[in-house]
């Protein structure tokens, strides 16, 4: 039996692979526990979705790419985080650490190295994030979701493993999806989702274009928390702040999606063969990882993308029309993609790579 420490947090994407792998490790007879921040989204997700897994909070600071007084304060938070993580790891004595990235992971990876605990890290985006760039110096291996990411990493440490897509994704119930929306089964469905926080600009453009869009589609609009507009009441248009348990049913009836370009989400659409129009987070809100993801997917023929600062009512409709025009060829391109590793295969690889010299 192997004991595995998991870490990663700050965004949903830095937790989702762990949420998939932890149950696999338990099913295979191993032990698992989680190290994350005190108040991050990872704590909420792990404690609500995996209540039997012990969660250990540590101090953590944010890794900023710009000069700020907060950077000086956060150095001390990171140092304390290393001490916190070292204390936990010393007591729990895991055989290995699996890190999904995010700023909370850095002190855990450094602490693991100080205790000679082998670490495997995972990068979901096309270009490695700052946390994983730092952690790579202390890790045994880094796994990538995009094959092209290998060009940014040392050959002896990097392996392409592809996306780990949750198994229930393809079990959505179409009948349930139509019941939830009261949609016509004979008209196409457009799913619009602006990420966990929503996108005010995307929401506004969808609403300004509502009549034109409803001519061709029925619309499921996931607006983000607090961004539902109750004044809009039109047949064929439904709004939710966000959807959790019923999302697979809504995806089952979706023909086209307009979405952010987070790695986990776009690989789920790819797995389901849903053509996508991607509106990545801009450089004013991120390091540009979603822009790279979106460009990569467009270059492979999986859909189209519009930078958020260039998004207009006109080009939204133009790109959706272009997707409809080329729908058959887009889906054919999607069908050429093959998932590399099941979560069971990935877990076995983690164990092998971490524990074999």
Swiss-Prot record:
UDP-N-acetyl-alpha-D-glucosamine binds at residues 166, 196, 290. GO terms for cellular component: plasma membrane. Its EC number is 2.4.1.227. Pathway: Cell wall biogenesis; peptidoglycan biosynthesis. The keyword Membrane applies. Gene3D superfamilies: Glycogen Phosphorylase B. Its main location: membrane. It catalyses: Mur2Ac(oyl-L-Ala-gamma-D-Glu-L-Lys-D-Ala-D-Ala)-di-trans,octa-cis-undecaprenyl diphosphate + UDP-N-acetyl-alpha-D-glucosamine = beta-D-GlcNAc-(1->4)-Mur2Ac(oyl-L-Ala-gamma-D-Glu-L-Lys-D-Ala-D-Ala)-di-trans,octa-cis-undecaprenyl diphosphate + UDP + H(+). CDD domains: GT28_MurG. It is a peripheral membrane protein. It comes from the Bacteria. NCBIfam families: PRK12446.1. Belongs to the glycosyltransferase 28 family. MurG subfamily. Cell wall formation. Catalyzes the transfer of a GlcNAc subunit on undecaprenyl-pyrophosphoryl-MurNAc-pentapeptide (lipid intermediate I) to form undecaprenyl-pyrophosphoryl-MurNAc-(pentapeptide)GlcNAc (lipid intermediate II). This is UDP-N-acetylglucosamine--N-acetylmuramyl-(pentapeptide) pyrophosphoryl-undecaprenol N-acetylglucosamine transferase. The lineage of its organism: Bacteria, Bacillati, Bacillota, Bacilli, Bacillales. The gene is murG.
